[in-house]
Amino acid sequence: MFFSKAGKAAVEWAKGSKVPYKEFALTLEKIEELSGKKKVDELAQFFTKVLDFSPDDLTACVYMSVNQLGPSYEGLELGVAENSLIKAVAKATGRTEGKIKEDLRAKGDLGTVAQQSRSNQKMLAVPKALTVPTVFNKLTEIAKLSGTSAMNKKVDAISALLIACQGIEARFLVRMLAGKMRIGLGEQSVLSALGHAFTLSKITDQKVRGDKLDSLKDANVKRVKTAYCECPNYNRLIEVALTEGVEALVEKCKLSPGIPLKPMLAHPTKGIDEIMRRFRNQTMTCEWKYDGERGQIHKREDGQIFIYSRNQENNTTKYPDIIEKISSCIGDGVTSFIVDAEVVAIDEAGLILPFQVLSTRKRKNATDDNGVKVVVFLFDLLYFNGEPLVRKPLRKRRELLRTNFKKIDGSFYFATSVDTNDTDEINSFFDEAVQNKCEGLMIKTLDTEATYEISRRSHSWLKMKKDYVDGVGDTLDLVVMGAYSGVGKRTGVYGGYLLGCYNPTTEEYESVCKIGTGFTDEDLAEQYKILQDKKIDKSPSYYQFDHTLKPDDTFSPYLVFEVKCADITISPRHKAASGLTDDGKGISLRFPRFLRIRDDKNSDDATSSEQVLEMYKNQEAFANQKIEKADAVDEDDEFEEKEDEEEELNMTNVSEGSSKENPVKEEIKKETPKSVSPKKFEKKPPVKSSPVNKSPVKSSPIKKEAEKKKGPVASIFSSSTKKNEKDVKVESPSPIRKKKLPSDSDESDEETSTNKKQPAKKRSRVAIDSDSD
């Protein structure tokens, strides 16, 4: 028998019957009102009841708790547009769409509007009670609808479900359909609740309490989370737990080809000094950081091959050319594997193209003839011939990768790398990577603390990019919460945006800056078009920003911008990390600049509040920064639109009352150095051998082949992947040493000057970090 904390028997339904949807909705209502650990406890009680009375329904309950219909890689998504939901609510309740919209403006939550509309509706007969499996199956059917009349069919199906809802059920049904539950319950909390439930459902002795019970729950939570990391499939996880026990999860739910895992990610770093501090007395390797898309390539024992994105989306149909050619890359005796790689766009000469180009590739049936040509850079092996390798050190994984896979010219290569702890060599290797259209370097431990940490951003991997060396340690991916109407040159489009980070604990978006810099006219036109379908009448309750920042138009969380900035500061108005700072104030960006749209990220994948706080604390100036000084700066006074200057395209950020030039203008306007042909590299004197490595420089066979074709392909593959066999050709001042690269011009000093009026250049959108690390 399951007992609540009050000691009384919890509300039950008949054993063996289906879980009532109302019981699930009431649980969500309670969770919405609770905070912290109490949310997990409440959900754990519900899961325990399900295990006791209707264990077959547990999988549907768990998926609905995380607002999913299946594993991410199956691609079943709800996310019904707000306008369609309004139509369905109006149809189900007999009210006009205008009245529904009016209530929505007042309430700010369509789920609440639907609940009240149904409660006020007179019914001739009480509808049959909904069950969790019934709702889950209906939602799955709705998600699978496609074709020209799919939206009308969805509205009809949703309307029918709403008619069957009673009371609180309508609120959470609509929220699920919208794709946002907004109860402050993240996936990690659901996994914890599941671990607690597996513990509580087995305990019949009420004397098992206190530390002993907590210890049992903690052990099972660890089992559940470990199993889910390697096998992110609730169907499989719950099946094993029910049939073989929670103790069998780690052994039975291992990494398996065909089930993508969330990749290991890197922490940003601003220079060599930080790298050497982090990796003191550790062997490490440096790899070029390619400007592409993360590609997780799986081969099963039956020969099927799949390619998944960093978000576990199935990209197999996007890269049929890779699937077709990969067999030639696989060595003899290889039966199954999971490879971590980077897919990069190249031109006909083999020159690396930016991620912006790759993002234009067709999502289905793309080839060299009708799409963007790509190559694959392999850098890690996670599973090989039936054995998971994630707990083995990188050196061993890399050895197996290079032994059992082959380079195929024009298609597959190993990531260009060098094993070294010498700062001069790292500097030179960084310069070479930047010269060859890469974003910078990935620095990784080889032997100690060198396992593959699934779904974690680890300090065992560091990324050093050209865009933030000696500046803020990383770019940010921020959600567009709202926009401000444009004037002057920007009349008819949006002139600027309100951006926010994501707080996964509260499931809220917290404002972090206003932005109006870095956009081309093409960018603004494209964004305006995209956002028209995302407009909502009122800022939702899960948007946190000061009333003085209210935008002209507000949007549902959809579009994600990659942004860089000069500085991160305490803010009296912005809400980012406001509950995490010492004084409770928020954090904001100074001189933010748009880089590109992150098509590969959902709104919940945006930079988190904790990451923003960490970036603030990691600034070099943090130790000397006084809050009083930070408070004196109103970062939004720097948001100014140049509406009367025909020659100016971009907005200029100016501090109120300041006549000084933008202090970040040099740093943010440097362009990527132009690619240099292999012959130009050879004219420069080679870098002197370091004390660590005095072996002669060897010429890469790939480079020789490329030179015969008289193309710059050698620029991509010029360095050896073996220790002490580097092919570093460029001797140029490193940006790490605060000097410009030879290709930097003084134009960047003029381009953002606030005292001079210079014609704005028509530039292509800067394409940088795909954050595919």
From Swiss-Prot:
**Where, by residue number, does Mg(2+) 1 bind?**
342
Recorded GO cellular component terms are: nucleus
Q: Which cofactor does it need?
A: Mg(2+)
Query: Could you tell me where the Acidic residues compositional bias lies?
Result: 633-649
Per UniProt, the ranges with Low complexity bias are: 687-700
- Residue sites binding ATP per the record: 287, 294, 342, 444, 463
Q: What positions does the entry give for Mg(2+) 2 binding?
A: 439
Q: Which positions are catalytic residues?
A: 289
Q: Which Pfam families match?
A: DNA_ligase_A_C, DNA_ligase_A_M, DNA_ligase_A_N
One Gene Ontology molecular-function label: DNA binding
Chain intervals with Basic and acidic residues compositional bias: 658-685
Q: What class of enzyme is it?
A: ligase
Marked site positions, Interaction with target DNA: 37, 311, 489, 514
Q: Where is this region: Interaction with target DNA?
A: 180-189, 362-364
Q: What is its EC number?
A: 6.5.1.1
Q: Which GO terms describe its biological process?
A: cell division; DNA biosynthetic process; DNA recombination; DNA repair; lagging strand elongation; Okazaki fragment processing involved in mitotic DNA replication
Function summary: DNA ligase that seals nicks in double-stranded DNA during DNA replication, DNA recombination and DNA repair.
Q: What is this protein called?
A: DNA ligase 1
The species this protein was found in: Caenorhabditis elegans
Q: Which gene encodes it?
A: lig-1
